[in-house]
Amino acid sequence: MFNKIAIVADHRGEDFKIVVADALKKINIDYVLPTYDTGAENDYPDVVKSVYKLYKQGKVDGLILLCGTGVGMMIGANKCKGIRCVWANTPDVAALGRIHEDCNALALGVNYLDNNSGYKVSLSKQKIQKIVQTFVTTAFAGGRHARRVEKLNNL
């Protein structure tokens, strides 16, 4: 379980921060919506760099990162020491990221293109909330997974 989670977004995920905050509020998880100056472009690498400072300072122990696909945020977060970020578009993927990899960050893509259909796919507010709630309430399994996480930490 997390003590405090930072919710951040680039320009494409900005409108969904309140959806995530509401999901956390419903299950009594403390959160912060940090302010940061990443310039007019609000590029996701700058957002990740900014929120990582809060994590390093111990002010938060979890991150929820929102952007168009979620992929850029995930890549950026996984470059930060101590962060294990799962990209999830279903509650099951979010849960497995916690159970197997002890992920402390969740990247969500709020809208992206489906390569099969070519149509823009958006996660519903309800689905975002379910993914978030599943992520923060799922425990790490430990055991053999702890050994694997330690190996990841030492890469």
Set out the residue ranges of the language-model regions.
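Short, solvent-exposed amphipathic alpha-helices that sit
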Residues: 15-26
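Helix-loop module immediately N-terminal to the HCX5R catalytic loop
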Residues: 40-53
